[in-house]
Amino acid sequence: MEHIIEINGLNKSFGDVKAVRDLSFHVQKGELFAFLGVNGAGKSTTISVMCGQLRKDSGSVVICGENIEHGLDKITRKLGVVFQNSVLDKSLSVRDNLRSRAALYGITGKEFKSRLSELAAMLDFETILD
């Protein structure tokens, strides 16, 4: 069966703190997968590496057949993550919050405007953008 996520020997440190140490796992297409652990176990760090928000120290990360070393742009366009706590800025409009998050994935300018317009119409939230 096809693996949609393959993590092999992943390591990530912050100075002397080893946040992720030699982590390996895979998720097969169609499989239900839960990523559980105590606070400080490296769950958020691992997900941040998978999304390209943090650089790994070593190991390999392959998502949908794309290695994050070479195919991060393709990966981030297919991958979505929702964290337990809100990452939205209450002082910004819906439009500006979406713009700042989209920029993290390289979606800016005309592409952002076009995609926002399409999604706002499809999901019926044009009236709350500003």
Which residues make up each language-model segment?
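Short hydrophobic beta-strand immediately N-terminal to the Walker A/P-loop
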Residues: 33-35, 47
